[in-house]
Amino acid sequence: LNQPMLDHAAKMQGADDRIAWRQADALALPFTDGEFDAVVCQFGVMFFPDRIAGYGEALRVLQPGGEFHFNVWDQISANEFADVVTQTAAAIFPDDPPQFLARTPHGYYDVGLIEEELRQAGFTQIAITTVAETSTAPSAREPAVAYCQGTPLRNEIEARGGDMLDHVTAQAEAAIAERFGAGPVVGKIRGHVVTAKP
């Protein structure tokens, strides 16, 4: 999270001396050993440059009996809006398809690998639950803009032609509307919720 995001969170939270908003490197947490009874990471571990090291840091700052909770997206084919956007971008750039969504947010979904990496970091009790839900939006426009312009997919699109962002977004909107309808849209989403203990 960048500092403006944390500043916004602090503003929305309101004054509470029990909460400190600060940037930290997940691979080198600025906290003492055993400082927390829980560590929570919402859709973030897939961005760690070294997940085992990040998991090790979570373990280090946990008190005995503490818990590490996180979630990750399942594979992109189980997350319909993201999949449609990725397929649309690939059709526009067939020689060099943007793969951010498939590679990163939806690229760390193998529960066997997740468990193995947690064990390598020192966790011994691991529970992984797969959760399927639906995502809704007022129209096809919202998920198209969210994925194409509100994630690092935007950088990959712009790298292939700075003037292509609006075109890819419009094509993604059309593809979502074609598959899910022109009015309010509902698509399947699926992820894994993980709890790990020492």
Regions found by a protein language model. Name each.
Residues 3-14, 90, 115, 119, ...:
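Class I S-adenosyl-L-methionine
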Residues 26, 37-52, 72-76:
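A short SAM/SAH-binding and catalytic strip from SAM-dependent methyltransferases
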Residues 1-32, 38, 52-56:
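Class I SAM-dependent methyltransferase SAM/SAH-binding core
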Residues 52-53, 63-138, 154:
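Conserved catalytic/acceptor-binding region of the Class I
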Residues 14, 49, 63, 123, ...:
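Short conserved AdoMet
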Residues 3, 48, 52, 79, ...:
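Non-membrane alpha-helical structural segments and their capping/turn regions in soluble enzymes
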Residues 14-16, 40, 86-89, 144-147:
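Short, hinge-like loop/turn segments at secondary-structure boundaries
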Residues 103-198:
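Conserved Class I S-adenosyl-L-methionine
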